[in-house]
């Protein structure tokens, strides 16, 4: 078996697949597809119980009018109290996906503790500035789940060929030659992106006055040994 590698413009060579191994250094972003039942339950809880969901503004960076919490497992504080609106099987699903990220990245051993889950609903002009996340501890995984995306994000002010309205932008922490330093996915509903707490990210505003953009974020604290897991070998 062989694969074709395009290593120069217009030039192809055959290379045996046994001659190639991909080794990555730095941090990763993993995208998952949310099961339809989980997706519907999360949207349903938000839409039917919105009036009872705690306001999450005081502990978030977003310039968004509607930021409401579904779960908080950290220590009670003046900004938030412990609560849970999610059934056990939904929390178990979140834990299983975070475990997959860590196992895929060969991080072990580790201990997990769900810290917080909340929903942002962005109207036209609202946005999330560049920020990072943290939970009870400084090491962990954050995420963005696409719950509701307008088909029309509104008019672009310039460069319609490079649409940015309502776009998620993730900025990597790695540097150096040939590094891929940022990621702006073409997102779809049910996409779920997982990345590390300190990985900077933002969401640009959309401009459609008749639509909302709804996403979920979940923070999972991860206790692990950074020295024991730092090698890719």
Model-assigned labels for residue ranges:
Residues 2-109, 125-129:
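Non-heme Fe(II)/2-oxoglutarate
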Residues 26-28, 113, 139-141, 212-214:
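Residues at beta-strand starts and edge strands
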Residues 112-121:
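A short glycine-rich, His/Asp/Glu-containing loop-to-beta-strand
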Residues 209-220:
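A short alpha/beta connector and helix-capping loop motif
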